[in-house]
Amino acid sequence: MKKLTKKQNLFKTFLNHTKKYDIDEGITLLKKMATSKFIESLDVAINLGINPKNTNQNIRNTTILPHGIGRLIKVAVFTQGENEKIAKKFGAEFVGLHNLIETVKTKTILFDVAIATPDVMPYVSQLGPILGPRGLMPNPKLGTITEKLEYAIKNAKSGQIHYKNDKNGIIHISIGKINFENTKIKENLNALISSLKQSKPSQSKGTYIKQVVISTTMSSGIKIDLNTLNNAS
């Protein structure tokens, strides 16, 4: 029989995989199991009552987490002229058009969010095969194709996240770091769930928030009792 690693033994000691934990208990358990030398991200997987094969039920949206995700968000802005000065003024790390496009073509991507003004989208559209699979392609529905650069950059840097369901109808997203206070983790999670409920497709019937599982970068998942979340029912 293969010997369990120290980390696996730790999970086995603390975790009952069949149990649904109170949110506070679940967060506390994750903190006990987070023994890595780096500060692990705190991730959530939310199983939704949607049919992902039906395009009308697929979900893609943004929301702002009240406490951010615990790291500096680097923003790229594709634009030209006076808008370049505006983007730099409000803190975008990478600003420009043709030079920035050529950099991305080399697959050197050092930013977390890409924003573009509408006038340059005919140029930026060629980056779809590179930025699209990474979830970085500017999109008007996500507020990342806009003339309002100040607003878009501030949102990106203040904890705005972009989420969409996978082919199984599950949302996977980071909502912070394991060293966040429990209250801040819960408030971030509740903000996400509130946004998801507002995005519920009219065609979705029955239970919408079916399951919530929290984990860290290196841990097993912990199922959460939905009754202990403020707005998941």
Swiss-Prot record:
Disulfide bonds: none
Membrane-spanning parts: none
Keywords attached to this entry: Repressor, Ribonucleoprotein, Ribosomal protein, RNA-binding, rRNA-binding, Translation regulation, tRNA-binding
A Pfam cross-reference name: Ribosomal_L1
One GO BP: regulation of translation
Molecular function terms, GO-annotated: rRNA binding; structural constituent of ribosome; tRNA binding
HAMAP family per UniProt: Ribosomal_uL1_B
Task of the protein: Binds directly to 23S rRNA. The L1 stalk is quite mobile in the ribosome, and is involved in E site tRNA release.
Family named by the database record: Belongs to the universal ribosomal protein uL1 family.
Protein's recorded name: Large ribosomal subunit protein uL1
Organism of derivation: Buchnera aphidicola subsp. Baizongia pistaciae (strain Bp)
Gene that produces this protein: rplA
